[in-house]
Design a protein with these regions (language model features):
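Charged/polar interaction segments and conserved charged motifs
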Residues: 1, 83-86
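Bacterial N-terminal signal peptides that target proteins for export
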Residues: 1-8
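C-terminal active-site/capping subdomain that shapes the small-molecule cofactor and substrate pocket
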Residues: 11
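C-terminal motif of bacterial Sec signal peptides marking the signal peptidase cleavage site
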Residues: 14-17
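Sequence context surrounding c-type heme c attachment/ligation sites in exported
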Residues: 19-68, 73-77, 81, 88-191
C-alpha cells in the first residue's frame, strides 16, 4: 500500500500542476484596453470638441469665426489632438482587447446595448476594419487640428459636422451592429 501511494504521489502532483495552469485567471491586458482609450481619450475629447464649437455655430449653420475666441481655437486644437492620438493608438493595436477581466462597458445591460463579450466578438471578426475606422478618425482629427491652428472656420466647420458620422460608422460596425439596418433605413428615408 505504501509503495502504491509512493508511486501515485508524483502522478497526482503532475496532474495537479497541469490542472493548476488552467485554473489561473486570464492575464490582465498590459497597457490600455480598447475601452480605456475610447472612454478616457476619444469619447471625452470628442465631446469637448462639440462643447467648444457648438456655441460658435452660426445662424445659417457652420462655424462662425466671429464666435470663436483664440482660447476656443486653442482648446479645439488640443481636444482634436487628443482624439487623434487615441485613434492612432487603436489603429496600431496588435491585439485589440475590449476590457480587462471583471470590468464592464458603457451600455452593457441597456436595451440595444451590448456586453463586452459581444463587442469583442465583433472586433475579433474583423480587427483590421476597426483599425481602419480608427485610422480614418485619426486622419479626420489631423485635418481638424490643422484647421484649428490656422483658425480656419471654413475648413473646421465641415470636419466637425462630419465627426458624428465618422464615429457612428465604427459604432454601428462594432458597438451595436444590430442597429445598423435601422439607422441605414432612417438615413435613406430622410434623404
Amino acid at each position: 500500500m505504501k509503495k502504491t501511494l509512493f508511486l501515485a504521489l508524483p502522478a497526482i502532483a503532475l496532474l495537479a500542476a497541469c490542472s493548476k495552469g488552467n485554473e489561473q485567471p486570464q492575464q490582465a491586458q498590459a497597457g490600455p484596453t480598447f475601452h480605456d482609450v475610447m472612454k478616457d481619450q476619444i469619447d471625452k475629447h470628442a465631446d469637448e470638441v462639440w462643447d467648444v464649437t457648438n456655441p460658435a455655430v452660426g445662424d445659417k449653420g457652420g462655424l462662425d469665426p466671429s464666435k470663436m475666441t483664440d482660447e476656443m481655437w486653442k482648446q479645439l486644437a488640443e481636444d482634436a489632438t487628443a482624439v487623434e492620438e487615441g485613434a492612432q493608438q487603436i489603429s496600431q493595436m496588435d491585439k485589440i482587447v475590449v476590457i480587462r477581466p471583471g470590468e464592464t462597458i458603457a451600455d452593457a445591460g441597456v436595451p440595444g446595448g451590448h456586453s463586452a463579450a459581444e463587442v469583442q466578438a465583433e472586433i475579433d471578426r474583423n480587427p483590421q476594419g476597426l483599425r481602419d475606422h480608427a485610422a480614418n478618425l485619426a486622419a479626420t482629427m489631423r485635418d481638424l487640428v490643422a484647421a484649428a491652428n490656422a483658425k480656419d472656420a471654413a475648413k473646421a466647420g465641415p470636419i466637425i459636422d462630419s465627426l458624428d458620422g465618422v464615429c457612428e460608422g465604427c459604432h454601428l460596425d462594432y458597438w451595436y451592429p444590430d442597429q445598423k439596418a435601422l439607422v441605414e433605413k432612417i438615413i435613406r428615408e430622410n434623404k
